[in-house]
Amino acid sequence: MNNQIIKINDIELANNKPFVLFGGINVLESRDLAMRVAEHYVEVTTKLNIPYVFKASFDKANRSSINSYRGPGLDEGLKIFEEIKKTFNIPLITDVHEPHQAAPVAEVVDVIQLPAFLARQTDLVVAMAKTGAIINVKKPQFLAPHEMRHIITKFNEAGNNNVALCERGSSFGYNNLVVDMLGMDDMKVMAPVIFDATHALQRPGGRADSADGRRAQAAELARSGMALGIAGLFIEAHPNPNEAKCDGPCALALSKLEGYLTQMKAVDDLIKSFAPLDTSASDL
């Protein structure tokens, strides 16, 4: 297992440390909603003593339909991020889609996310690496876990060694994702691993013009991932998931956040209390 520690301000992200929550809302729908969601996450994570990084997107550039809501855009999004950071004194994570976005985002945001569909775009990788920001790489649905080494190497060769990997499911036929738990465990050899338990619930293209999801199984899937002993958990919640402008079918209801995280913390604490157990030996 890779026990590299990535420092996000005073937070330690590592496979053998207490898990870090990367949580928030899928896309910035409005300033007021983002502030409300951030405040609730801060209250719950403070109560449960869970290290916390706020997540939202300023632009959803890969929507199924050209008519789908994308977000407020870079400039307005960064203003909202700055207010959240100043108000709650928390680190932030967001995704970028084009090389020119990397530098301005890194001036405000602590962790930059490389989207799964863009994970092999070398120009984007290099631009992100050069900011010196912490990087979260979403594993593409179409790549094997061992292939993530190549993406890490790109970042390293471009001068950035603070790279985490994020599992979000693998394509399993049409309109379906499955999570390869052994594959996620294999990635722990390469870097700190984060589990995106929200987007792993997706049924891509499952609706006429958007993705469907399996919110009812959010706790089951997340508990399974936490049982691997990982560095972080990535989730999205919404006050009214059925009214969310993106990925509502996968989002947790905000009112369920405390109970959900209480379970995840209990699993993480239990798993990381065990002594290492080597089952590779073949002797009797």
From Swiss-Prot:
<dbReference type="InterPro" id="IPR006269">
    <property type="entry name" value="KDO8P_synthase"/>
</dbReference>
<keyword id="KW-0808">Transferase</keyword>
<comment type="pathway">
    <text>Bacterial outer membrane biogenesis; lipopolysaccharide biosynthesis.</text>
</comment>
<comment type="pathway">
    <text>Carbohydrate biosynthesis; 3-deoxy-D-manno-octulosonate biosynthesis; 3-deoxy-D-manno-octulosonate from D-ribulose 5-phosphate: step 2/3.</text>
</comment>
<comment type="similarity">
    <text>Belongs to the KdsA family.</text>
</comment>
<dbReference type="GO" id="GO:0008676">
    <property type="term" value="F:3-deoxy-8-phosphooctulonate synthase activity"/>
</dbReference>
<dbReference type="Pfam" id="PF00793">
    <property type="entry name" value="DAHP_synth_1"/>
</dbReference>
<keyword id="KW-0448">Lipopolysaccharide biosynthesis</keyword>
<dbReference type="InterPro" id="IPR006218">
    <property type="entry name" value="DAHP1/KDSA"/>
</dbReference>
<dbReference type="GO" id="GO:0005737">
    <property type="term" value="C:cytoplasm"/>
</dbReference>
<keyword id="KW-0963">Cytoplasm</keyword>
<dbReference type="GO" id="GO:0019294">
    <property type="term" value="P:keto-3-deoxy-D-manno-octulosonic acid biosynthetic process"/>
</dbReference>
<protein>
    <recommendedName>
        <fullName>2-dehydro-3-deoxyphosphooctonate aldolase</fullName>
        <ecNumber>2.5.1.55</ecNumber>
    </recommendedName>
</protein>
<dbReference type="InterPro" id="IPR013785">
    <property type="entry name" value="Aldolase_TIM"/>
</dbReference>
